[in-house]
């Protein structure tokens, strides 16, 4: 590797540490040496993101790292070195008044609620989260807005430094993976910490039980720093309790949102779904604690209630939410989580659920949304379509089985690629997997779905004769499976082609210039297109991967890419 390339990698490591697939363990194993901070070259936003993408670890090297596990503590030591290369010390982070949040599901929504609540007090907020949905600059937000393309281009290798230079009053920092050895855990003195709902995810890195995962999440606890969590299963909650005692961290269990609402009007949430109430309850406690520890007035009047004990954990105080808190909860926006886009006859339901528990919550939300929908006035049928992909070490068969009760008429699978060739869009590039891997994975998803569909003996609404093999220009990756099964599933080579088939030109915003050649080569695609074209309403659930949801949003909401 040339000195210039090594130089650039060192300078960008801090900003890229939480990007897809890259870990400080990888960088530490490569032994990058220290270099002075380089002068920023003149470049456009996409050029900056492409340069940042050079730090994504390729799939082959990731496999090597999995086989040769090193000491995870070296990741944090390496992270401190990379921070120093950017011109900062760990002590500089102490001045950011950080709220540090981890969890398996809901941590992003909790952070969004918390940031919006405190911004409603007139405080200047910073927000670091991952992954991004459409553009990488979404990961750094000042006062709720993603950093501009111009500023990202200027500061893209010093993103933490960017927070320091804007002199924010506080920073809400979302953990990337786990907690104990996550790159964000170089934070030494947060004001308060939070743990959202726990579940099974990233098992190759965090462990294969919820208890092992809870130990990792509890790694963000700090001596003397208050921490809050929501009600968890007894096993992982006991692990969090023991971890807190070991570190001398005061850990509290959040009361329910109903307890905070008692005696006042209901709290309106900007995010849909019953599961968001747990995230909102945690966010209120984090904001309340931060305001108290910063001696900020207006933290909310405590209610007359005796503190309780549950599972040997003290309950956090019950207080009356202030008008600022109510405003913050109501105004919270968090794209790609229980999000609904209504476009003519099409309604897109977007939720980046990717764990069993979060998919269960997604299914409840989707079914409730359908129950409360307005009936279409047209004479055609109502059609339900699933657009799904899953990545990493997640069990797609288990996730797809949870989605069966939604009674989809059609299941569509595609990789997290917006276009067949996404080289022109650096924000959507992912070098941590190969193209062959993602296409094979989609075919496996289809096979799992067909097997589940056959088990359920669902009526075949999309029957078609056995197809002839598609031509070389076909956009469908696989013909019908040779064995007898439901014909209600298709695989497309990218998100754009999947959306074109699902929408049939009926989405007023998503209007590709011309349908790609071969879109209807497959007999099932041809027969299904007629049904979709005549449907009075089409309900599309997009789930399984935040990256899939991000790619869909990029195409359905072009303004997000501006």
Regions found by a protein language model. Give the residues of each.
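Active-site-adjacent alpha-helix immediately C-terminal to a catalytic or transition-state-stabilizing loop
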Residues: 550-562
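Acidic, Mg2+-coordinating active-site environments of NTP-dependent enzymes
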Residues: 3-5, 9-31, 165-175, 190-320
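C-terminal helical cap/extension that packs against the catalytic core
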Residues: 233-243, 348, 356, 401-536
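Short beta-strand-centered segment that lines the nucleotide-binding/catalytic pocket of NTP-utilizing
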Residues: 121-138
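Nucleotide phosphate-binding/pyrophosphate-handling subdomain across enzymes
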Residues: 170-171, 183-194, 198-199, 264-410
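Nucleotide-state-sensitive switch-loop elements of NTP-binding domains
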Residues: 134-136, 142-163
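Short functional linear segments
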Residues: 1-103, 110-121, 128
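Active-site-proximal loop/hinge segments that shape catalytic or ion-binding/gating pockets
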Residues: 545
